[in-house]
Amino acid sequence: MSKHLREVIKKKQKAYREWKKGGISKESYIIEVTTCRDKVRQAKSQVELDLAKGIKTNSKRFYSHINKKKTKKEEVGPLNTDDGAEVKDNLGMAQYLNKYFASVFNKTKEDLRDNGSMTNGNEDMEVDITISEVEAKLKQLNGTKSGGPDNLHPRILKELAHEIASPLAGIFNESVNSGVVPYNWRIANIVPIFKKGGKNDPSNYRPVSLTPVVCKLLEKNLKEKVVKDIEVNGKWEKIQHGFTKGRSCQTNLISFFEKVTDFLDKGNAVIAINAVNAIIYLDFSRAFDTVPHGELLVKLDKMGINRKIERWIKNWLKGRLQRVLLKGELSGWREVTSGVPQGSVLGLILFNLFITDLGTKSGSVLIKFVDDTKLGGIANLEKDRDILQEDLDDLVNWSNSNKMKFNSEKCKVMHLGINNKNFSYKLGTHQLEVTEEEKDLGVLV
């Protein structure tokens, strides 16, 4: 609040006291009230305008403001079980949700013991995380965020940043260079976040992991080093726009639709009829939860990441446990046999690296925002349609060999252009549904 606005509010409060004492008329008081109200509204509008203008440089501040304005908090349940029963109590719902979340994991429990199979990475270079790096990240902690299952709140860690930076740096370096991750860093409280659809369906909730804050601090340091290794080795994917430096929802949409528009323009110039485009929207089923650990580690090894960091990630993925936290009630623990934790720092970048080799052989346009994938191309003739279908088949083959599944019910095709022949496409054996509009990263297309 500005100094001028505080003075306006004080003036209104003073006018109120004067009016009550009979020192001024009601009309004079109302003038001060109106003036104050207008000034406050102008100030709020200016704040929101500044937030909107600064969304590219500080999007967290913008969305934090939006979330504070939301008065309605989405409730969980009641939940319907497989046998038709209804679960209403918080503990029962927590138990049932954790059972469901665990049911989507890849069932094959992989051997993640260090067998010396990592051969493509860099040399076993010592990882040196400095005290100043740790202290800086401690001071950047958001004191309003929730803690993890270790009950160490970020506000406490932030306030003690100077005192604990040195011992934490020692612990971090020992953990990474030995490849050993403490048990307490491999457990998570799961908060169910409602997506859309019926609230009685467990599949309509996203499991977000609240992991230990101390481990997240180390993850931030390791993420920086992993990104540096990937950039140095030229392994960073150009078509991935999700949680990538210099990329965003906006760059994803602009890049994709520039190419789609280019198809249309070239079609008009060359073919004498309007070029017809098809956009195929693809959606993975429980993408983050089903990433197979073994395949992920093989891919990381090929990307030239420091071997000590590879071994640390391997140990970090091994023997993970989760429980659901719902309104103070905690479910029992369940083993995590696949996936990368949503809510962790490394989870997003590991997923991005895992799907780096998801691609096509033709000139079709493929673009990604984390697990949201779009495939597009010209579809004037049967041969064009066949090329797009072959690309789809390649994507299905990739998903099968990488133990991932597309959610075929949510994968759709959109036809663009005049004289559209509305060719049909299949995702495996499933014929894709045609859609006339689609919400693409929050934008209605």
Predicted regions: what they are:
Residues 148, 187-190, 206, 239-244, ...:
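Catalytic palm active-site di-aspartate
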